[in-house]
């Protein structure tokens, strides 16, 4: 069924509820519906339609009050957009509803999609949208007591525009009290079978939480009865920052959304921007992008591998693997000039060409790693203690993973071979030979094995990049390429004007909505951009995999021991900046 046929079927089924179809530059059909039909439409798409849209990929809000280019769209003060995916169809659909700007209210779709509540809480936190039947109408990224909703267009975009903050003693006490592990506030039970449960603050300053993050637990002895993750301690307002940076200047921020993913964070953003501009990136630049992205996949997975072993009691592996990461970072630094946050990609290509001797450095790393991985397999994967701590622990199946929006290794460990690089090839991945590692049990052990095998596949991809690196330019010959090719800067008055505009004011993208999707180290990362014909983004929505993966803790943790929770958290492989943005 094509996208147009899907919209037709939806319009036929809900004649009075479907208001219009929005034409976007994406391949995703976008349909506006009446707010009172929200639950029925989402239930139809998830449960009743052939090859259903099982996964809620994202849900976000848009403040439309300052938007100028809205021709043909229904009147809206605040828009709620939900992004659904059908893996069987390899297709997505977006559903939008228009709300009042002053008092935005919508129906919760938590009864249809189990992972909707956190996204709805974020829409309330950032935009003030209240959802009916939302079980926990709490702020999620901002601290309790925060005044206002910062993503609204009436809210300041810089700290210097806000009133001076003064932490009085009474305010400090109030904030401390608000952070207490109150079971009623978190919806936790206090008794089971007549026995009082212990409420435990697990984090935020715990080595096992891998970042500033806490889980409020209800315990019966060592058994977890209920768990409520509490996030937001690392929130920096990345989406708000995008609204006050030019399209080009926001690039370094994308490296830091997932600070272990490096240049991979730049890929979905650039994919969306280049789609908006109609830029065709040269083959050499695309191949370099793939090579560096896979290098960072290896760097991340080595860190995961070592810390996962450490979380389950093995001390030595993490030191060996940090030695390997140091070798890898030397290669990355030699090529890009930086280690963890290179900011190496540009709109239309790369910041610079590969240096002399780059291939020798990469080949040395490729020759070094395989034997090391063989050693680690005996040290970790075949270790009886590691196997006892991970096999059968925190297991879930494919259906549960799709329900909670799990992507990446967490989904593939259940036996489902879904990888954006294969299903929806980008940047030239269709030209590379590699396999998708999968597990079968969906437990901590399989999630580890999948990532280890991904290291081997990344080595295979990188070797193909080195052996088949195209020649040619590293930047597109396009007026919106930023910065423009230097050799064209003084060619004539026209190129000089383009250079001046791009480097001073910044490139202006055509009005519209554009999306980039990439298989990053943790799963599906998606940038949904709205351009209003300005040098900066009108709305940048960043969908990260870690956000969805942590929400699932409340469904997986009950029934396991506290010690098993350590292994489960390690196997998720999340980064708190990726969660909180």
Swiss-Prot record:
NCBIfam families: NuoD, PRK06075.1, PRK11742.1. It is a peripheral membrane protein. The gene is nuoC. Gene3D superfamilies: Cytochrome-c3 Hydrogenase, chain B, NADH:ubiquinone oxidoreductase, 30kDa subunit. NDH-1 is composed of 13 different subunits. Subunits NuoB, CD, E, F, and G constitute the peripheral sector of the complex. In the N-terminal section; belongs to the complex I 30 kDa subunit family. The keyword Repressor does not apply. It catalyses: a quinone + NADH + 5 H(+)(in) = a quinol + NAD(+) + 4 H(+)(out). Its main location: membrane. Keywords: Cell inner membrane, Cell membrane, Membrane, Multifunctional enzyme, NAD, Quinone, Translocase, Transport, Ubiquinone. This is NADH-quinone oxidoreductase subunit C/D. HAMAP family: NDH1_NuoCD_1, NDH1_NuoD. Residues 196-581 are annotated as: NADH dehydrogenase I subunit D. It is an enzyme of class 7 (translocase). It is found in: Cell inner membrane. Its EC number is 7.1.1.-. The keyword Amino-acid biosynthesis does not apply. NDH-1 shuttles electrons from NADH, via FMN and iron-sulfur (Fe-S) centers, to quinones in the respiratory chain. The immediate electron acceptor for the enzyme in this species is believed to be ubiquinone. Couples the redox reaction to proton translocation (for every two electrons transferred, four hydrogen ions are translocated across the cytoplasmic membrane), and thus conserves the redox energy in a proton gradient. GO terms for cellular component: NADH dehydrogenase complex; plasma membrane. Residues 1-172 are annotated as: NADH dehydrogenase I subunit C. GO terms for molecular function: NAD binding; NADH dehydrogenase (ubiquinone) activity; NADH:ubiquinone reductase (non-electrogenic) activity; quinone binding. InterPro entries: NADH_DH_suCD, NADH_Q_OxRdtase_suD, NADH_quin_OxRdtase_su_C/D-like, NADH_UbQ_OxRdtase_30kDa_su, NADH_UbQ_OxRdtase_49kDa_CS, NDH1_su_D/H, NiFe-Hase_large. Pfam families: Complex1_30kDa, Complex1_49kDa.
């Amino acid at each position: 069924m094509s996208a147009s046929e899907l919209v037709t079927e939806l319009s036929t089924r809900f004649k009075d509820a479907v208001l219009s179809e929005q034409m976007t530059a994406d391949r995703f059909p976008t349909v506006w519906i009446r707010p009172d039909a929200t639950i029925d439409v989402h239930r139809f798409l998830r449960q009743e339609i052939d090859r259903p849209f099982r996964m809620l990929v994202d849900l976000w809000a848009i403040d439309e009050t300052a938007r100028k280019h809205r021709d043909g769209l229904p009147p809206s003060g605040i828009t709620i957009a939900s992004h659904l995916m059908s893996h069987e169809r390899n297709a997505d659909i977006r559903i939008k509803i228009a709300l009042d700007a002053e008092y935005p209210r919508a129906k919760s779709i938590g009864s249809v999609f189990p992972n909707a509540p956190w996204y709805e809480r974020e829409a309330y936190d950032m935009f003030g949208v209240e959802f009916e039947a939302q079980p926990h109408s709490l702020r999620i990224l901002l601290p309790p007591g925060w005044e206002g909703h910062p993503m609204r267009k009436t809210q300041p975009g810089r700290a210097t525009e806000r009133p001076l903050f003064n932490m009085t003693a009474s305010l400090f006490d109030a904030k401390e009290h608000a952070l207490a592990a109150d079971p009623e506030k978190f919806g936790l039970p206090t008794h089971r079978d007549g026995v009082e449960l212990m409420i435990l603050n697990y984090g935020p300053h715990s080595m096992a939480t891998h970042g500033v993050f806490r889980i409020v637990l209800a315990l019966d002895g060592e058994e977890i009865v209920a768990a409520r993750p509490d996030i937001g301690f690392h929130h920096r307002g990345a989406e708000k920052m995008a609204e006050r940076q030019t399209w080009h200047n926001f690039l370094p921020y994308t490296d830091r959304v997932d600070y272990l993913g490096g240049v991979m964070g730049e890929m979905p953003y650039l994919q969306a921007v280049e789609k908006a501009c109609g830029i065709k990136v040269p083959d050499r630049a695309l191949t370099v992008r793939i090579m560096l992205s896979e290098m960072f996949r290896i760097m991340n997975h080595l860190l995961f591998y070592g810390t996962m072993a450490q979380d389950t009691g093995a001390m030595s592996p993490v030191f060996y693997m940090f030695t390997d990461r140091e070798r890898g970072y030397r290669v990355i630094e030699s090529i890009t000039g930086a280690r963890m946050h290179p900011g190496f990609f540009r709109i239309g290509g790369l910041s610079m060409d590969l240096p002399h001797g780059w291939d020798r450095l990469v080949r040395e790393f490729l020759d070094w790693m395989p034997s090391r991985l063989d050693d680690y397999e005996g040290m970790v994967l075949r270790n009886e203690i590691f196997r006892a701590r991970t096999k059968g622990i925190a297991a879930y199946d494919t259906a549960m993973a799709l329900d909670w929006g799990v992507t990446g290794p967490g989904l593939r460990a259940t036996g489902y071979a879904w990888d954006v690089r294969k299903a929806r090839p980008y940047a030239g991945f269709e030209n590379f030979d590699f396999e998708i590692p999968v597990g079968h049990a969906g437990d901590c052990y399989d999630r580890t094995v999948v990532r280890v095998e991904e290291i081997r596949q990344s080595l295979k991809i990188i070797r193909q990049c080195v052996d088949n690196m195209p020649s040619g330019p590293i930047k597109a010959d396009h007026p919106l390429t930023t910065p423009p090719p230097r050799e064209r800067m003084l060619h004539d008055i026209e190129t000089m004007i383009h250079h001046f505009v791009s480097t001073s004011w910044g490139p202006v993208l055509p009005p519209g909505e554009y999306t980039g999707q990439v298989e990053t180290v943790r799963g599906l990362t998606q940038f949904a951009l709205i351009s209003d014909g300005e040098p900066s983004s009108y709305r940048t929505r960043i969908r990260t995999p870690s956000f969805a993966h942590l929400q699932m803790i409340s469904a997986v943790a009950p029934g396991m021991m506290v010690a098993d929770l350590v292994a489960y958290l390690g196997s998720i492989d999340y980064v708190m900046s990726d969660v909180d943005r």
